[in-house]
């Protein structure tokens, strides 16, 4: 480990909870974060127990009235100061994310840049999606306003520990909500460093609170009567659990952004290396740990498809993998933990036992590291393919005969996050748009490509119809409709059955 890393690593238990503007030591169990590459300890602290979580929610509730009544300009000033601090500390935060996730430094720099860009996008989205509008109606005015929910719990994932929670926290605060943030227990350090920047930005006490920990902390937060909503990004398994936990509480807003078993259809291969590059980016970027990564690669049967697969396999085998700060820079690093690496290897073995054919065997070169090499497995001949999101560098190949069959296969999943098409036939893309059950449908672009100026989310097991990104503003505030008239006068025409022509008493 470099001297720089040793200097910055948090190697002893410390105050890692941020509640009511103060850093506190948790009352829960001690837990630690290890470097996925070296397994050396990076961070250690005590988790938040039920008492800590309750305290954080009470702090957020107490801070809500003043924050909600502050002007939009006042709230935006704090958030813009946070963006300025992100710019100032971009490199150090990117290094922290790289250490925790093993993502290459070039990639985590883009993550912090996305966090910065989220502020301007969120301001635009707030005004576009949930702003103030009025329409004349005779002698009155129809006015639409939006009001914050109150206290929102934000659950962050580990694959983008800066960007994805930021995509909930920024619009939530902008709308006037207060927040209790529970990051993944696999990326506590990134969360701590991010909240320190919010503190420097001048966020008022209690407006943003941080509780660290695993499942017990998360369940305690979801069970809090003081929260008015919960914003979650993570696995379908955890999302379903939270949905059940909040069942029978329609008064609480629940936004679930979950994973996908995404299909990339390779219908035409005009420029072979261009298609291979797109497929590599779709399958293996971030070591396959993006919810939009292609888990299923649908390749047309025939010589063109055969040649594409040979080239795809060769390029995947030659991908540079390694430590985040190595030079030349690697394309991808390790998966998030040794346990995640073991799950991926078990998934590959399961598919092979079902009858899959390995085109490129995923391996773990060092048992003391979570680094995996890319894997490609042909599952065309498996009769009952598991409909699972294997969150790592493993892609399944399915051969098909015609486009109609490809569309059918693409939709054979309980998920509905992303689907993509490689073809120069516009009519095929139009057909895909009509038949796809997915929130993101890309044409000749990587599945992992998305715009912050568009909604991000899916259907089925990929979410509960509350897409994030530009549409996050929608669930961070509720609409208030008013009919308004400054002066009350008796209508010239009364409703039938009403008369004021009464005998004098």
Swiss-Prot record:
Show the GO MF annotations: succinylglutamate-semialdehyde dehydrogenase activity
Does Cell membrane count among this protein's keywords? no
Sorted alphabetically, which CDD domains does this protein's record hold? Answer: ALDH_SGSD_AstD (cd07095)
Give the catalytic activity.
N-succinyl-L-glutamate 5-semialdehyde + NAD(+) + H2O = N-succinyl-L-glutamate + NADH + 2 H(+)
Instruction: Kindly identify the residues recorded as the active site.
Output: 257, 291
Pathway membership of this protein? Answer: Amino-acid degradation; L-arginine degradation via AST pathway; L-glutamate and succinate from L-arginine: step 4/5
* Biological process according to GO: arginine catabolic process to glutamate; arginine catabolic process to succinate
Entry EC no(s): 1.2.1.71
Keyword NAD belongs to the record: yes
Q: Which domain of life is it from?
A: Bacteria
- Which Pfam families would you find in this protein's record? Aldedh
Which keywords does the record carry?
Arginine metabolism, NAD, Oxidoreductase
**Which top EC class is named for this enzyme in its record?**
oxidoreductase
Q: Where does NAD(+) bind?
A: 234-239
Protein role: Catalyzes the NAD-dependent reduction of succinylglutamate semialdehyde into succinylglutamate.
Sequence similarity? Belongs to the aldehyde dehydrogenase family. AstD subfamily.
- This chain belongs to which protein, by name? N-succinylglutamate 5-semialdehyde dehydrogenase
Gene (name only): astD
């Amino acid at each position: 480990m470099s001297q720089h890393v040793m200097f910055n690593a948090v190697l002893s238990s410390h105050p890692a909870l941020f509640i009511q503007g103060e850093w506190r030591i948790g009352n829960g169990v001690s837990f630690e974060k290890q470097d996925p590459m070296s397994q050396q300890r990076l961070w250690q602290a005590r988790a938040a127990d039920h008492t800590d979580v309750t305290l954080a929610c009470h702090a957020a509730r107490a801070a809500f009235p003043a924050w909600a009544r502050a002007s939009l300009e006042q709230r935006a000033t704090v958030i813009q100061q946070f963006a300025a601090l992100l710019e100032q500390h971009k490199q150090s935060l990117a290094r922290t994310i790289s250490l925790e996730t093993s993502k290459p430094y070039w990639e985590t720099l883009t993550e912090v840049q996305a966090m910065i860009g989220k502020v301007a996008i969120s301001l635009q989205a707030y005004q576009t999606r949930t702003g103030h509008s009025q329409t004349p109606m005779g002698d009155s005015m129809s006015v639409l306003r939006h009001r914050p929910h109150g206290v929102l719990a934000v659950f962050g994932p580990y694959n983008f520990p800066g960007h994805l929670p930021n995509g909930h926290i920024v619009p939530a605060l902008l709308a006037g909500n207060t927040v209790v943030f529970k990051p993944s227990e696999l990326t506590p350090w990134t969360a701590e460093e991010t909240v320190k920047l919010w503190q420097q930005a001048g966020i008022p006490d209690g407006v943003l609170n941080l509780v660290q920990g695993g499942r017990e902390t998360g369940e305690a937060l979801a069970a809090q009567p003081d929260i008015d909503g919960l914003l979650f990004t993570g696995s379908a398994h955890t999302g379903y659990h939270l949905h059940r936990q909040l069942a029978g509480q329609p008064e609480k807003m629940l936004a679930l952004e979950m994973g996908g078993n995404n299909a990339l259809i390779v219908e035409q291969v005009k420029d072979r290396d261009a298609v291979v590059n797109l497929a590599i980016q779709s399958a293996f970027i971030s070591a396959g740990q993006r919810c939009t990564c292609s888990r299923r690669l649908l390749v047309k049967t025939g010589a063109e498809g055969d040649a594409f697969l040979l080239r795809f396999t060769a390029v995947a085998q030659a991908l540079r993998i390694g430590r985040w700060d190595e030079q030349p820079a690697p394309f991808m690093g390790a998966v998030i933990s040794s346990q995640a690496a073991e799950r991926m290897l078990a998934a590959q073995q399961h598919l092979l036992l079902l009858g899959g054919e390995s085109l490129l065997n995923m391996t773990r070169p060092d048992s003391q590291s979570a680094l995996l090499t890319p894997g490609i497995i042909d599952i065309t001949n498996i009769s009952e393919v598991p409909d699972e999101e294997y969150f790592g560098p493993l892609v399944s190949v399915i051969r098909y005969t015609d486009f109609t069959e490809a569309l059918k296969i693409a939709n054979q999943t309980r998920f509905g996050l992303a689907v993509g098409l490689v073809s120069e036939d516009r009519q095929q893309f139009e057909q895909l748009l009509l038949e796809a059950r997915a929130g993101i449908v890309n044409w000749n672009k990587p599945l992992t490509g998305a715009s912050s100026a568009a909604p991000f989310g899916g259907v089925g097991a990929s979410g509960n119809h509350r897409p994030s990104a530009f549409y996050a503003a929608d669930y961070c505030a509720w609409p208030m409709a008013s009919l308004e008239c400054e002066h009350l006068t008796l209508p010239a025409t009364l409703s039938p059955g009403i008369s004021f022509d009464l005998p004098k008493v």
